[in-house]
A protein has these predicted regions:
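Surface-exposed beta-loop-beta
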Residues: 1-77
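Membrane-embedded beta-strand positions in outer-membrane beta-barrel channels/transporters
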Residues: 1-3, 43-45, 84-86, 135, ...
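Transmembrane beta-strands of outer-membrane beta-barrel pores
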Residues: 8, 18-24, 50, 61-67, ...
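Short loop/turn motifs that connect adjacent beta-strands in outer-membrane beta-barrel proteins
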Residues: 9-14, 51-54, 92-104, 145
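Transmembrane beta-strands of outer-membrane beta-barrel proteins
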Residues: 12-16, 55-59, 85, 104-108, ...
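Outer membrane beta-barrel transmembrane domains
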Residues: 25-27, 74, 88-141, 149
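Residues that define the transmembrane beta-barrel architecture of outer-membrane proteins
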Residues: 38-42, 79-83, 130-134, 167-171
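Outer-membrane beta-barrel "beta-signal"
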Residues: 87, 166-179
């Protein structure tokens, strides 16, 4: 794997990364079961913080190529892609519950993943199997390395044949601490 990035003090950072490798069990007990099959990923990421408003924008988009056996049906995608953009806006910075540098943020995540890029060989129609999401949220950071977050996730999931999407929504609560 490898990553390269360019950073500008005002504009932010743009990076490109790649990773990959063999993912299947191609031998067992000295017997060759299959050839080595690879999965390879290329991703572009971006992050910046507005010096005027403190707004943070972070995003990533990835392309994936999977070596799927030709005998598998088209429901096993050989190409995938997806990404997200997170926008985080601090709305309150002050002492809260004894934490001197607490921050309350409004957040929004927009995301898309297509698990099977392409068209059906027989009909030429687009293969579905993709998810779109909009996730507004509220996060509290009592200290820089800890976050308590409440989101409402709005999701549209398309099946393989791109029938009308399953529409789901729900609250998510999370706590994370990085050290």
């Amino acid at each position: 794997s490898a990553k390269a990035a360019v950073r500008h003090e005002r504009l932010g950072e743009v990076g490109i990364s790649t990773m990959g490798g063999v993912f299947n069990q191609f031998k067992a007990d000295g017997l060759t079961l299959d050839r080595r099959r690879r999965v390879d990923v290329v991703a572009i990421d971006f992050n910046t913080v507005s010096q005027r408003w403190g707004t943070s924008v972070l995003g990533e988009w990835a392309w994936v190529v999977v070596d799927v056996p030709a005998t598998y049906s088209q429901q096993f995608g050989t190409r995938q892609r997806g990404g997200f953009v997170d926008i985080v806006q601090p709305v309150l910075r002050r002492r809260v519950f004894g934490f001197n540098k607490a921050v309350l943020n409004l957040a929004l995540r927009l995301g898309h993943v297509d698990h099977n890029v392409g068209r059906f060989k027989e009909s030429g129609t687009v293969i579905g199997d993709e998810v779109l999401e909009i996730v507004p949220g509220l996060s509290f950071r009592p200290v820089p390395g800890t976050v308590i977050r409440l989101n409402y996730r709005i999701e549209r999931a398309y099946d393989l044949f791109r029938d009308p999407p399953a529409r789901t929504g729900g609250f998510q609560f999370g706590v994370a601490s990085y050290f």
